[in-house]
Amino acid sequence: MRNIICVQNGVARHPDYRMNEPVSLAIGEGEHVAIVGRNGAGKSLLVDMLIGKYPLLMNEVHYDFASSVSSLVSDNIKYISFRDSYGEADGTYYYQQRWHSHDREGIPVVADLLPEAKDEEFKRTLFGLFGMEALLDKPLILLSSGELRKFQLTRTLLARPAVLIMDNPFIGLDAATRDLLKSLLRQLIEATSLQVILVLSKSDDIPDFITHVVPVADRVCGAKVTLEAYLQALPVVPDRLLSPEKEKRILDLPYKEGMHSEQVVCLNRVSIRYGERTILKELDWTVNRGEKWALSGENGAGKSTLLSLVCADNP
């Protein structure tokens, strides 16, 4: 099988960007890989090596994109990193811009930010999968986190890369939107020759279309194994992570002195609207001292908006 990306005993030239052991990893044609490890394990350093971000000592990364019209690594590998619900779509965007209408002047709509398509048929496939037609006239700052994820993927994939690397693709998405994104990625790889590499912190996030897993821990790249072998080797997680005694001690921790109010949060007929869209309408909400709440809702339902009010992060 042809390897599209291959590194043997790779060591970054700069000490700050080195893994703790030389990296040997090959990704074959048709493989879809998950790089899995805890935060700080070295996953991003490994990806930086695979995309040729930093020069290596002696051995370099070898690429084989024989079926591509371009031989450039930058044309064949695209990398998207997501930090939170709103990712990195635009460096000038900030969450409260939604509420400052004067700051929205000149904010582009989705259609303005999509590049020229190299392949019109592929563009139609993408637009159909991601439902982009309905978003084209929508300002970027009005997209929900799920919609923004679709926009970012479409913008990147219009360049027709051979490999798409996504770092933290499911961060900030609710369960339904995570499942939708996994389904869209599966349909995408079934309809095209695209290969996907996902960088994940939790093994629970690995989609079933992944063929192989590369575990990373303590800045060491583990051996690539099949998804089945990786899942079989996972330790069994106990039903309870804390004993009842420890849970009780945590719940019985005293409040700080001075917290005497019975009402911690009190909202009375709160409404928030931007443009023609109403996010919160005449909301009454009281949180009493000692209560523990969970906010639940789909992406775009208004959870972050409500929390911004509670945290006084609003104009």
Where do the language-model regions lie?
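A short, flexible loop at the N-terminus of ABC-type nucleotide-binding domains that lies
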Residues: 1-31, 40, 55-57, 256-282
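Pre-NBD coupling/linker segments of ABC/ABC-like ATPases
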Residues: 1-4, 8-9, 18, 90-124, ...
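The feature captures the beta-strand-to-loop junction immediately N-terminal to the Walker
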Residues: 36-38, 296-298
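ABC ATPase nucleotide-binding domain signature region
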Residues: 44-118, 307-315
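Conserved ABC ATPase signature
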Residues: 139-147
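Hydrophobic anchor residue at the start of the ABC signature
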Residues: 152-153
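Catalytic Walker B motif of ABC-type/P-loop ATPase nucleotide-binding domains
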Residues: 164-168
